[in-house]
Design a protein with these regions (language model features):
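Macrodomain-like recognition of ADP-ribose-binding/processing modules
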Residues: 1-145
């Protein structure tokens, strides 16, 4: 079996689990309820950037995204999804293997992104723009599992 087929099977298993496991289903509903679209043109409130005693450290490692995030278990961790602006999960349903697809293959992220609200506010406008550069729009999705 090639990698693409294996990726599709893994995603199908994730989909099955997210639909049939009540804890995962509840977690997905909770994440979707807290999910927020932030337009690139939206003005963000002033931020107090001096709230931590120690300065941020930037660490470059060979770890995969969720592997690196797991190191900070129990803390509030944000993961940057280098995402497709036109397809939720990129090509995860077809077995593609870039970063977004990997995130969606092993979590409930795809099922949070693939909602009517996000299609209307994020994916369809980007498709209609026909601009490969897209813009600075953001989807914030809390508490992915």
């Amino acid at each position: 079996m090639d990698r693409k087929e294996m990726n599709k099977i893994i995603f199908q298993n994730t989909e099955y689990m997210c639909k049939t496991d009540s804890a995962l289903s509840d977690a997905t509903k909770k994440s979707v309820s807290g999910q927020r679209f932030i337009a690139g043109s939206e003005k963000l409130p002033g931020l107090n950037l001096n709230i931590y005693k120690n300065k941020a450290r930037i660490v470059v490692s060979r770890k995969r995204t969720y592997e690196a995030a797991a190191y900070y278990k129990g803390q509030h961790v944000a993961v940057h999804n280098f995402a497709s602006a036109v397809n939720p999960g990129g090509g995860v349903v077809y077995g593609a293997g870039a970063q977004e697809e990997c995130l969606c293959r092993c979590s409930n992220l795809y099922f949070c992104l693939n909602t009517p609200d996000m299609w209307g506010m994020f994916y369809m406008p980007h498709r209609a723009a026909h601009d490969p550069i897209h813009n600075d729009d953001i989807i914030y999705t809390p508490d992915i599992v």
